[in-house]
């Protein structure tokens, strides 16, 4: 390895073989190009393993001290950019072991006692993913806070509510934004739940059947912060459920980011015009000088595909594998690494977009909710309150809307006399019920968009998200 400090040599398992690997197969087989990402976790796991071996009398305390000192030296070399594994290291585990032997001599060869790369990589991957989950959960919360800040700024602002992308009923904009806070809360809870199944130690399962070496699995599990142990050694080295489950959880995060992103794209269009994008979160066209493009939500929408693809790839990878470890598992790492990276980047970008990248155009919103038939349901509710059966009221209002459309007028434009021709129970107070703010205020059921109910939601979320300190 030119320029490195790990040294070279044949593979650790090569004494069994008479010929070396074909160079192309060596390149095809190696994972060092990406699993070096697990270096810190590999060092942590190895130090815990060395200390446990000494506690169990397998090696001496002095040898454990030497091993841990060597591992810390490798950590320092990596921090300084001097630890440079090469292709002949195959993976991060061999790279560390070779460097350790180069540093310590025969003592370095004792580290792998009672351990296989199979349980070692499972341990590394779980430690790495646990750390990433612990970073992602606060990111989700940070984005929730950004949404909540926007909601608090628009507690009395109205926006058209849609079904089938057709205007349905006006809602409070804060209520609309809080719907995404709710989705993200489920995402956060899913990540916390996934963490429980990530945080189980496979270390000590060895290759597949356990080890005759007198080890203490509970000692290494405790030292590494695991909540428990795999009870079955075959399951311990074969399990990648946690990788699938995590990828599914992030896929749902991406779904929710993409749904909001799609709405922002729609809101920012000239056809809609509900939001104005800031220069800090939009780009222009190389040809059309008038353009301001919503790149952030478009990229989030597009990046869903790669996360969903990794989830499908993991499922496909493990679906036909016999017990126990198989080389197919090498394919889990790049998928997980990219799922984490993509999810984190998208959360960060959408947080910036919500905090700094858009502003709602209240004049356009006010005009939108006043210029449609989204108050039609309230006419039906008005009639129901006057003892008209709902289905009859529904039919009456449908006829009124049909007439208005043919005449090019809105419900508010009809005279009282005209209204009463449709049903005698209608009085002048109908016009108050048709006002957009009254339409929203009337939705007083728990969880509804009525202003008082929205204030309850805002208060509850401000407390839950500790917004004053966030």
Swiss-Prot record:
EC annotation from Swiss-Prot or TrEMBL: 4.3.2.1
GO biological process: arginine biosynthetic process via ornithine; L-arginine biosynthetic process
Subcellular location(s) of the protein: Cytoplasm
Keywords: Amino-acid biosynthesis, Arginine biosynthesis, Cytoplasm, Lyase
Catalytic activity line of the entry: 2-(N(omega)-L-arginino)succinate = fumarate + L-arginine
Keyword Lyase in annotation: yes
SUPFAM superfamilies in UniProt: L-aspartase-like
GO cellular component terms, A-Z: cytosol
Coiled coil: none
First-level EC class: lyase
GO molecular function (one): argininosuccinate lyase activity
Pathway this chain belongs to: Amino-acid biosynthesis; L-arginine biosynthesis; L-arginine from L-ornithine and carbamoyl phosphate: step 3/3
Family recorded in the similarity comment: Belongs to the lyase 1 family. Argininosuccinate lyase subfamily.
Stored PANTHER family: ARGININOSUCCINATE LYASE
Protein name: Argininosuccinate lyase
Organism name: Synechococcus sp. (strain WH7803)
